[in-house]
Structures are given as structure tokens and as C-alpha cells.
Amino acid sequence: MAKGRTEIAELGEFGLIDHLTAKFQNKNKSTICGVGDDAAAIEASKDKAVVVSTDAMLEGVDFDLTYFPPKHLGYKVVTKGISDVVAMNAVPEQITLSLGISSKLSVEFLDDFYEGVEFACKEAGVDLVGGDTSASVTGFVINITAVGRAKKSEISYRSGAKEHDLICLTGNLGASYMGLRLLERERRVLQGLGDAVTPKFEGYEYLLERYLKPRARYDMVESLRKEGIVPTSMIDITDGLASEVLQICKSSKCGARIYLERMPLAKQTTALAEEMNIDPVIAALNGGEDYELLFTVPLELREKIVNLGCIDIIGHITAESTGAALVTPDGSTIALQAQGFTPKTAKTE
């Protein structure tokens, strides 16, 4: 009897991953953590682990070369790769890079791309140690594998959040998404007008940098360790705050309350959102690609977190039965919903 057809959109990104990997079970004792977290953790010695992550980026889905400079793209690829390692509270050390190269690309384009890769590697202190190249008939394809190390006792998984833990966030949200929307707007406006007209980016340079050249928060791993803080759970913001909170809740079997008035938004984010008639809260919740860190810590560490001065406490963990919700200033709650990848949204995420 023939199998029925199930559309990928019916499952969504996270449902698809669960579906494809449900039958896989770890067989090796050296596998500490497999599918289901930001990265895999593999035993390296009695007290240390190697952390490994891989990511793919496809032209026309994850980036548009009509407005993405190759140097910035190379930088962003490294950020995307090592951010998953950082989200495990590990220190990134090496990357490998494999490319599918279309005939429309030139050697000069690739030189610029690798210049961006080199700059990001130097900045983060990681080594490019290998990779592969192949021809592509579907545009530029990029795959990065990032490797890091950490003590087993210092790794933060998505599954460790406990009721009453504080929910903490580095940086601000929504800036990358608004940078993307700005680029898309100017591209549409300028189509067919020729090179004599320049795009209007003045006043929104920060948003462009957050989208085109984001920086992984590897600095926070060192800051947390200096304070003796090991997050009970952690994840990086790649699919938007709502998706990441729900991922922690799912893995930790808990609920969450995020307070709207505590969500950090940059001035340029709110200004452009108002100009484009976009709710900045939606940009923060579902925009993604901020590459900030969302993590939880026990309530008794509140003073240490506050003293760091670069982290916002935006909510707390609750019982699983309460679900995950956004709390508005008047005290009402709105259930959080994940965005993630679907074929309909792939070109704008």
C-alpha cells in the first residue's frame, strides 16, 4: 500500500528534525549529547568534552548575494558556526568549511569571502582546519562545522532549566531582522533605477551590521566563568526569542514567563519598525539571527548576573503545566508560538 504524502510545512522545522531523528539512539559511551541540542558533546577525557556543531547556508534561502557582500558573508558563516558551540558554554577552537560553488562566482568573489572568514577566525581565536569544495548548480552552498572544548561539568544543555530559575539574555533582539527588512525594502525601491541612485541606510547602520556582520557571544563564556556561573540551560538566538524559549521548555519539561517590558530593543530597531509599520515585539520574538545567548540560572545568582552589567533578566522558569507565555504590562499573558523554518518563510528568514 502506497504511503500518503506529508508536506514538510505540516511539521515545521523542529517537528521535521524530531521526525527524521526519532529512531536514532546513541550507541557509543563517548557520546554525551547527540541530536536535540545546539551542538553534540563527545567525551574527550575523564573530565573534558569536545563540542561539535554543523550548519548549512543556501543562496536564495539564507542569504541574497544581490545585497550581501562576500566579506560579510564569510564573517557571518563563522559566527553562525561557532555560536552553537558557545551556546553549550564551550570555547570554540576549530572550524571546517565546505562549499558548493556555482559557475557565476569568480575567484575574486571567493577571495573576498575567505577574507571575511579569516577575519572572523582571528577575532574569535579559531582555526580553519579543513573543508571541501564542489560544483553547485543551485547557487552558492555553504556548510560549516565548528569544534570547541569544555569541562563536562561546565557544559550547558537545553535540558537543565528548573522552576524559579531566572531567564537571562545578552544584548538586544530584533535588530538583525530589521536590518534584513531594510535591505529588502531598498532593493525593491531601487530595482530598475540603475546605479545612479543609492540606497537610504542613513541612521540605521547598526541594524545593517547586526544582520550582515553579527558577532557570536564567545566573550560571554569567559565572563560567566570568571564569576563562577554555569547556566542551568542555554541556547543561542537564531530563530527568534519565542522559538528558543520553547526549545528550552520542551527539553527541560518546564514553562516560562517572559516580561514584555523587560525585552531589550535597540533604538534603531524600534525606529525602523515604526517607520515600516512593523511591531518591534514581533521582530524580537520571531525575527531571529541575533546570535545572542538566552540562558537560565538559579535565583540565588541574581546579584552576580546584575553585577555583570551586560545581561538582562527577562523572565523566569515556571511549572510545565503553565506553558510558555509573554506577560504584558497589564498582567495578561499571550502564549508563545515558534516561527522556525518553513518553505513559505525560508526566503525571508
Feature-to-residue mapping (PLM):
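Glycine-rich anion/phosphate-binding loops
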Residues: 33, 66-82, 104-115, 153
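Small-aliphatic-rich amphipathic alpha-helix that forms the alpha element of a beta-alpha
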Residues: 70-94, 115-123, 223, 243-248
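Residue-level signal for inorganic ion chemistry
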Residues: 41, 81, 89, 128, ...
